[in-house]
Structures are given as structure tokens and as C-alpha cells.
Amino acid sequence: MLTVKQIEAAKPKEKPYRLLDGNGLYLYVPVSGKKVWQLRYKIDGKEKILTVGKYPLMTLQEARDKAWTARKDISVGIDPVKAKKASSNNNSFSAIYKEWYEHKKQVWSVGYATELAKMFDDDILPIIGGLEIQDIEPMQLLEVIRRFEDRGAMERANKARRRCGEVFRYAIVTGRAKYNPAPDLADAMKGYRKKNFPFLPADQIPAFNKALATFSGSIVSLIATKVLRYTALRTKELRSMLWKNVDFENRIITIDASVMKGRKIHVVPMSDQVVELLTTLSSITKPVSEFVFAGRNDKKKPICENAVLLVIKQIGYEGLESGHGFRHEFSTIMNEHEWPADAIEVQLAHANGGSVRGIYNHAQYLDKRREMMQWWADWLDEKVE
């Protein structure tokens, strides 16, 4: 392997020459003396050379790092020379994605557009963004999907496949691709399907309460789990909760329309239990984050999407209970006790347009929901072994 001293000592000769570093990486020294890092590699049976960077602008370690990244791409069938060429024109996946995104975001909420952009920026574009879109093979797109599957994010994996498919279709109709590999990947994915989430029958709730009382992990995750049960919110709605939208005086939480499934503001009355929990939490996360349930390592983000599931797993209820299961239990028990169906549906944010006679802003139903949610919180607390 090369050393810095060898590189600095390399002088131009009558003919160009190479100083080998290893694994295909070498320093090319032309007659002019302007040294260049290059990587020799083979793909699809053909030998190619990638110009990695110029010395001394790119150090030895930087060249090794870039060569390592290129070799990793090669191992999954990505040609770094083609990727470099594609990144400089408007036929790369990244360039076409940006066109598609600008076209589509006009009909999306700001929150959804931001969430989708983050998914592409974090997990998709770093892998295939620099490739000519017409050269992307199914295996290369599958490599992207595997990133989600490997961390258990099956729903996001399917979402990524569908949205990538839309980018390919956009490329096809604009004359820059002829084939969309996304639909063909469905059979290769790890069995994603819409499923019924686990929930507990009423007679098992006391045992769950007892187990939850033994949890000794993150206080933020524990309070998140309890608030999720008391409010019957969706996990996404809970995670997005901001301190500015928690009104202790009027005892309501407002969930922004951008994160709601129905794209409407959701007003949630707070029971005594929720007020107490959020008051406790305010001394922990409010000084350091806008998020009520701030992440452990990055206070600029909320807790991870699996935080509540991890609590459930730790207390021994994996596969038996879930965040969505809390909502099912709330709906079942409240209907069994003959609370107004409309009030239950509004609390679950199932209301859509005029489906419950426009009662989102009806004071009577907010008052009824205050009463209902206090009854629900008390009912849960009474279920002890």
C-alpha cells in the first residue's frame, strides 16, 4: 500500500506511470506531473477505469474511501463510470425524481411532501440517484427496498417501491426510459401485506397493565405508550405532537392537518391522566425540543416509529398487543358501553367530509368527548389484577 511520503516523492518521468495502492486503486502520474487517483475495475466482463479525484485536492485516505464506495456499488451491479456520467445530465434517477417531485408536490400536504423527500434523500437517492434511469436493473432497485426491510420497516418498503415506480412511469412518459422494474419486485419482497394488528380482549387488559408497570426503560417511551392508550391516537399522530399544540389551560391537544390521515386538524381532549403525564414530560423534553416525544439521540426529531412497540415487546406482549390495538380496544369497549358512535368516530379521526354530519367543530361533541375520554382513562386505570 502507498504511503504519503511515496506520493509526495513521485516525480514525472518521460512516460506516464502508476503507483499501486491495492484493490484496483492507484495514483496515475502523467508526464505533466498532475497526479490523479484512478480505480481499475471489471463489470459485466469489461475492464474500466474510474477517475476518483486529483491529488493533492484528494488525500490518500479520501481516495481509499471513495474507491471503497465505488467497489461497494460495483458489487451490486452499479457501474460507477455510468453513475458519474448520469449525475451530470437530466437522465439520472435523481434528476427525474426531482422533476416528478416538483410536479406532484402541488397536490400533497406540506407534511407529506417533506416526509417523502426525506425518504428519498436518506434511503433511495444515495443508492440509485446517480444512475441513468434506463440502466437501472430490478436487482438494483431491490437493493434499495432491502434497506427498509432490513430494519423492519415493511410498510415503508412497499411505499418506497410504489413511489419509485411512479418516478419510472414519469420517465417513460417523458421519453427517458422504457421499463419500470418496480411492479416486478412485489413478489420478491418480504411478504408485506395490509394486516390486522394484534389487540387484547378486555379480560386481558389487567394483566397488561401489571406488566406495563414493570417497564424500566425510557420514561419518554413509557409516557408515549400510556398517552397513546389514553387518547386512541395513531402512532404517527402521537409522534408528531408539538409542545406548541398542547393547550394545558383548555386541556386539548391539536394535531396538525399535515400528519392526519384525513388531512384535517384533529382536536383531542385531555383526561386528567394525560394532563398529568404531559406535565411530567414537559420538564424533560420541552426545554430541549419542539417535539413532545423527543428522540433520545436527536432532539430535533421525535421518538422512532417503533418506540411503543419496543415497550410492548420488553414487557412480554410482542405479537399480542400493538399501538393500533389500543385504538381497536378503545372502539370496542366504548361501543359496548354505548357511548355515542359519532363521538367515538371523531375521537378515532375516522370522520371524513360529512360522514358524521360535520361534528368536528361542534362544541357539544367536544364536551361529550371530554367526558368520554375521562371515562376511558378511568376505566383503563381500574383494570388491575
UniProtKB/Swiss-Prot annotation:
Entry superkingdom: Bacteria
Positions in coiled-coil regions: none
Domain Core-binding (CB): 91-172
Pfam name, any one: Phage_int_M
GO biological process, one term: symbiont entry into host cell
CDD domains: INT_P4_C
Keywords linked to the UniProt accession: DNA integration, DNA recombination, DNA-binding, Viral genome integration, Virus entry into host cell
Residue ranges occupied by any Tyr recombinase domain in the UniProt entry: 195-373
Molecular function as annotated in GO: identical protein binding; prophage integrase activity; sequence-specific DNA binding
Alphabetical list of SUPFAM superfamilies matching this protein: DNA breaking-rejoining enzymes
Active-site residue list: R234, K261, H324, R327, H350, Y360
Similarity section: Belongs to the 'phage' integrase family.
Function: Integrase is necessary for integration of the phage into the host genome by site-specific recombination. In conjunction with excisionase, integrase is also necessary for excision of the prophage from the host genome.
Protein name per Swiss-Prot or TrEMBL: Prophage integrase IntS
Organism of derivation: Escherichia coli (strain K12)
